[in-house]
């Protein structure tokens, strides 16, 4: 399986690479290619990905230099190639498909929050109210109708994950690749299982 990670210049990117590489399918670890968000869409396509992961990163999704090729990938690749957006990856997807992203009332950096979810897709066989690591000062304030909200903070006040209704695109606001997220390997594994079955 070929996995492309679009790196939005985040310190967690290589944690994602490690988590992906630790998930063999058919006795083979995924081949992971990391492309900076300054890469071209042609470079992403040339890597012939079976799956794409859009990394976290600093900045705002409405600032082109902060997300680079991410927006092109979301529009041109994600409709057919299974894609997982993480943190900025989720914010970029919401923004690109017509939602809004704003400042959080309280920035969350290195804190955990219990997450409730729909027990499907990337959350299949994952415990309810698992602790999820959060490192973000932005939140998705309106979710486009093309997405289903699949996870929230326990009180339901903030979306923590979404899934596109028609495309193989799932996104999480939290960081599955952080050691503070106890089920991170399982979330990544469920994503890779879905990608392999696509």
From Swiss-Prot:
Function of the protein: Part of a heterotetrameric complex that catalyzes the two-step biosynthesis of anthranilate, an intermediate in the biosynthesis of L-tryptophan. In the first step, the glutamine-binding beta subunit (TrpG) of anthranilate synthase (AS) provides the glutamine amidotransferase activity which generates ammonia as a substrate that, along with chorismate, is used in the second step, catalyzed by the large alpha subunit of AS (TrpE) to produce anthranilate. In the absence of TrpG, TrpE can synthesize anthranilate directly from chorismate and high concentrations of ammonia.
Q: In which pathway does it act?
A: Amino-acid biosynthesis; L-tryptophan biosynthesis; L-tryptophan from chorismate: step 1/5
Q: What are the GO BP annotations of this UniProt entry? A: L-tryptophan biosynthetic process
Q: Which sites bind L-glutamine?
A: 57-59, 137-138
- Please state every residue range assigned to the domain named Glutamine amidotransferase type-1: 2-198
EC no. given is 4.1.3.27
What lineage is on file?
Archaea, Methanobacteriati, Methanobacteriota, Stenosarchaea group, Halobacteria
Q: What subunit structure does UniProt give?
A: Heterotetramer consisting of two non-identical subunits: a beta subunit (TrpG) and a large alpha subunit (TrpE).
Reaction catalysed by this enzyme: chorismate + L-glutamine = anthranilate + pyruvate + L-glutamate + H(+)
* NCBIfam families linked to this entry: Anth_synII_Halo, trpG_papA
Q: Return the protein name.
A: Anthranilate synthase component 2
- UniProt KW Isomerase keyword: no
Highest rank taxon of the organism: Archaea
Q: Which UniProt keywords apply?
A: Amino-acid biosynthesis, Aromatic amino acid biosynthesis, Glutamine amidotransferase, Lyase, Tryptophan biosynthesis
| Pfam families in alphabetical order | GATase
Residues the record marks as active site: 87 (nucleophile), 175 (for gatase activity), 177 (for gatase activity)
Instruction: Cite a single GO MF annotation.
Output: anthranilate synthase activity
Q: Please give the PROSITE patterns that the UniProt record associates with this protein.
A: GATASE_TYPE_1
